[in-house]
C-alpha cells in the first residue's frame, strides 16, 4: 500500500468546465477509468488501461505510446500512480461578472493521492485550458514533504528542514506555513508527537534513576 498524500485544491474557470469537475467529484459510483478526475485532466491512452505493470519493457507499447504500462504513464503524466475518485469538503462559489451574470465559478475540494500530489495532471489541464486556474496544496507527513502549487509554480518543502524546531518553528507564522497548518493540522500533530517523545524520555530516565536507587523497576 502507498503512503497517502493529502491534497486540497481550488479550480477557477468557466461554468461549463466547473460543471464537469463538480459532476466528477460528486459522483459516488466510480465504475470506469473515464470517471476519474485525473483522467479528465489528462486522459490516459486507452491502449494502456489494461496493461500489466510488472517492470518489463514492451517495445511495441513503447513505440506506440511511449510507455510499457499504465503505471509508467501515470507516474510521468499525473505524478501519481492512480487516479483519484474520493473527495471531501466540496464547495462551489459563483463569481459574478460586471453585469451580474455568473459565467465563472470556483470549486474547492480535498482528496488523497498515492505517494505524491498529481501536479503533472494540473500542468496539463491548465496548458490545455488557458481560461482555467488551479491553486493546490499538499502534505505527505510520512515522506516529510508539503507544498503549494499555484498555476504551474510548485513550492515544495521538506518539513523537517523548513521547520527544524518542530511545532514552535517560526515557519508556521509565515503565510505559507499558516495556510498549510490550517488545512492539515501539522503543528497539532507535531506537538502531540513531541509530547509523546518527551513522556517516553522522562519514563526512560525515571527507570534509570529508580534502578540506581536500588528500587524495583518494571522492565
Residues covered by each model-derived region:
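Intrinsic low-complexity, intrinsically disordered or marginally ordered coil/linker segments
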Residues: 1-219
Amino acid at each position: 500500500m502507498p503512503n497517502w498524500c493529502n491534497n486540497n485544491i481550488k479550480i477557477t474557470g468557466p461554468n461549463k468546465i466547473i460543471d464537469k469537475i463538480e459532476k466528477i467529484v460528486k459522483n459516488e459510483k466510480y465504475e470506469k477509468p473515464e470517471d476519474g478526475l485525473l483522467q479528465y485532466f489528462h486522459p490516459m491512452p486507452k491502449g494502456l488501461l489494461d496493461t500489466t505493470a510488472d517492470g518489463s519493457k514492451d517495445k511495441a507499447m513503447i513505440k506506440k505510446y511511449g510507455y510499457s504500462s499504465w503505471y509508467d504513464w501515470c507516474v510521468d503524466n499525473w505524478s501519481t500512480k492512480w487516479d483519484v475518485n474520493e473527495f471531501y469538503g466540496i464547495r462551489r462559489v459563483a463569481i459574478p461578472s460586471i453585469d451580474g451574470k455568473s459565467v465563472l465559478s470556483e470549486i474547492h475540494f480535498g482528496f488523497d493521492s498515492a505517494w505524491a500530489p498529481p501536479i503533472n495532471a494540473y500542468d496539463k489541464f491548465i496548458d490545455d485550458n488557458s481560461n482555467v486556474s488551479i491553486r493546490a496544496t499538499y502534505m505527505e507527513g510520512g515522506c516529510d514533504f508539503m507544498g503549494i502549487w499555484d498555476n504551474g509554480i510548485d513550492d515544495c518543502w521538506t518539513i523537517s528542514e523548513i521547520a527544524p524546531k518542530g511545532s514552535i518553528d517560526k515557519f508556521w507564522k509565515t503565510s505559507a506555513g499558516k495556510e498549510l497548518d490550517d488545512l492539515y493540522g501539522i503543528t497539532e500533530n507535531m506537538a502531540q508527537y513531541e509530547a509523546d517523545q518527551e513522556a517516553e524520555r522522562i519514563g526512560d530516565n525515571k527507570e534509570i534513576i529508580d534502578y540506581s536507587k536500588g528500587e524495583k523497576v518494571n522492565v
